[in-house]
């Protein structure tokens, strides 16, 4: 059994904790995750590894439903945290985790992503205060950060207001890509974590706007 668990842990399917094991497997079979999760997985995983290092034990963390944020959530399973999320797939990861407290935000559930959004979600979030909010985005241009749903960006703005620190996690393919709904200006988040394939021009641009962290390891893996 121990050997089987070690193999599953190497595959990132489970996370072993003291006295037990927790599921931390792949994203659920929702259109949002099925179409995106396999793409640029190495980049998303590198970004997630950097993001979880910013989160301290006993932090209150608010997580959205992006595929990169889901990777962050997988790596947080088993840690003593207060987790708040708008995303049902993320909530499912922590539902059986006795080491963390879980609050699930309700509202209008998007069937593609399993994410709560809209006025009910915004109302619940407005009554909360968290240490860190972690968000994914669909696009980044000179005009700012974008996502692909008007209700979603309204909810994410409430998530930003609720946090002492806002962390955006985005792989380098998002730069120069515009999506439907404008979320915020480039300098609005406190921190942006990207992979090491970010174009140099964007690296300089974003470094002038906010705290930019470049997650290393992707280029090295491709060389090897």
Regions found by a protein language model. Give the residues of each.
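Short glycine/serine/threonine-rich phosphate/pyrophosphate-binding segments
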Residues: 68-72, 175-178
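Conserved phosphate- and dinucleotide-binding cores of soluble alpha/beta proteins
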Residues: 10, 16, 43, 89-224
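A residue-level structural signature of the nucleotidyltransferase/glycosyltransferase Rossmann-like core
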Residues: 60, 82-83, 132, 191
